[in-house]
């Protein structure tokens, strides 16, 4: 995914916007998807697509899961191994970190950012 993004944005002026709403346990393309696991987090924007993704992830990881969601139910189970990562706790086989690491390695952007909150 990182290579495709780099091919599209490399050498072109771009501004990226992400709306972090109705964060579901699986990709929206999955037919078996469940109710959102996280509340609406907000809107993020950056000239750096990787910094944008990292800011969105960090905001999600610090959010409280929606009660009754797959994530909240997983965390409530006494035998559940908490990975301290909402995405892995929802979908243990998730390897989202490797995509961001690879994107930084190929020069798509930086995972460092300064968050400016606007209200």
Spans of model-derived segments:
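Extended, low-polarity segments enriched in aliphatic/aromatic residues
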Residues: 1-119
């Amino acid at each position: 995914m990182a290579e495709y993004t780099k091919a599209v944005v490399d050498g072109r002026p771009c501004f990226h916007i992400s709306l972090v709403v109705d964060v579901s346990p699986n990709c929206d393309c999955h037919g078996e998807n469940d109710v959102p696991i996280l509340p609406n987090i907000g809107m993020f924007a950056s000239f750096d697509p990787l910094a944008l993704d990292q800011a969105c992830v960090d905001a999600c990881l610090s959010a409280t899961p929606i009660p009754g969601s797959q994530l909240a139910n997983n965390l409530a189970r006494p035998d559940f191994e908490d990975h301290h990562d909402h995405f892995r706790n929802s979908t243990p086989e998730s390897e989202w970190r490797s995509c961001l690491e690879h994107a930084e390695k190929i020069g798509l952007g930086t995972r460092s950012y300064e968050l400016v909150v606007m209200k």
